[in-house]
Amino acid sequence: MKLIQGVLFQDFYSDKKKSDRSSSLDLRNTKILNLHWHSGFQTDGREELPQVSAFNAALPDSFISFSDRRKMLFSCGVHCYLYDYKIESVWNTPSSAISCLRKYQCVIAPDFSVFVDMPRALNVWNIYRNRWVASYWQSEGINVIPSASWGNVDSFEYCFDGLPENSVISVGHVAVGRDSSYRKLYRLGIETLIERKHPDKLIVYGEPLGFYPETEVVYVEEKIQQLRKI
């Protein structure tokens, strides 16, 4: 009888702990979801992507990665051209890096992955996250440079929505490769971005484009390019 009571007693507290953990998790998730979807940002396009404000300030001489933000090189800008898992925190806990990022000259909006062969819903989701974080950071006083990314030609229906006109805009040019079809698609994306948004300057993170778009281009070397020069 005592054994049974002991088991029941243990199960009761075990269940209570699970319930407490679950309640805490639910509360945290509720706060995050409320923050994400009840933020009051203006939206743009059919997918209702948050509208990012223009960036027209002077650019810093160099950029460091989001992973290196704690090195306190505040005269630099910060870029987020990293694997998604290294920047997930800006979505999962949006306010966690605010106080640090405010000290930098500017921050390029996070570049969540968009791929040619990824389902449309996932590409829309990652572009939504890009626009939301950029808008949230701007609302918190951070100087944010909008960033653009795209998948296949069909993604042009939504991938430039939420980006401002006549602004500095950043794009990544890291994993395009030598495949001619991908390079043509990338060039078409650049040309479409310029046609629709008329950026004042285009920041290109990675290798040179190999062509000369009709706007001023500022190149930012990726880390591997910098290391090769050492």
Spans of features found by a protein language model:
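Intrinsically disordered, low-structural-confidence terminal and linker regions
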Residues: 1-21
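Residue-identity detector for glutamine
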Residues: 5, 10, 42, 51, ...
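Intrinsic disorder/low-structure terminal segments
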Residues: 8-11, 40, 54, 148, ...
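Non-catalytic, usually N-terminal nucleic-acid engagement modules in DNA/RNA processing proteins
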Residues: 24-98, 118, 230
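Eukaryote-skewed repeat-based solenoidal scaffolds used as protein-protein interaction platforms
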Residues: 67-70, 83, 88-229
